[in-house]
Swiss-Prot record:
It is found in: Secreted. Keywords: Antimicrobial, Disulfide bond, Fungicide, Plant defense, Secreted, Signal. One of its GO terms (cellular component) is extracellular region. Its main location: secreted. Belongs to the DEFL family. Disulfide bonds join 27-86, 40-64, 49-75, 53-77. It comes from the Eukaryota. The keyword Signal applies. This is Putative defensin-like protein 39. One of its GO terms (biological process) is defense response to fungus. The keyword Signal applies.
Length: 88
C-alpha cells in the first residue's frame, strides 16, 4: 500500500513540475517597432537590434531573424512571457 502511495506522490510531483515548466516556456518574439528596417543588413545588425530592444523597447534580448512565414531578415525582440531571457 505504501509503495502505491509513493508512486502516486512522485507522479503528482512530476506532473506539477511539468505544468509549471510548460507555463513558463513560451518565448514571445515581436518585430521591433523602433529599429530601422535596414538594421539587419549592417555588419553589426544583431548588436544594434539587441541594443534597440533592450534600451528602447524594454525586451530582454533582440536578434535579426527570419521567422516562419516571413521571407525577410528583420529585427525581433524576444523574451519569455514571464520576463526572463530566451534563445532565438
Amino acid at each position: 500500500m505504501h509503495s502505491k502511495l509513493r508512486v502516486v506522490y512522485v507522479l503528482l510531483i512530476l506532473f506539477i513540475l511539468f505544468i509549471r515548466h510548460a507555463t513558463t516556456t513560451y518565448c514571445e518574439k515581436v518585430r521591433s517597432k523602433t529599429a530601422p528596417r535596414d538594421v539587419c543588413k549592417k555588419s553589426n545588425g544583431n548588436a544594434l537590434c539587441k541594443k534597440t530592444c533592450w534600451t528602447i523597447e524594454k525586451y530582454v534580448n533582440g536578434k535579426c531573424l527570419i521567422l516562419p512565414k516571413t521571407t525577410n531578415l528583420d529585427c525581433y525582440c524576444y523574451h519569455y512571457d514571464n520576463g526572463s531571457a530566451c534563445r532565438a
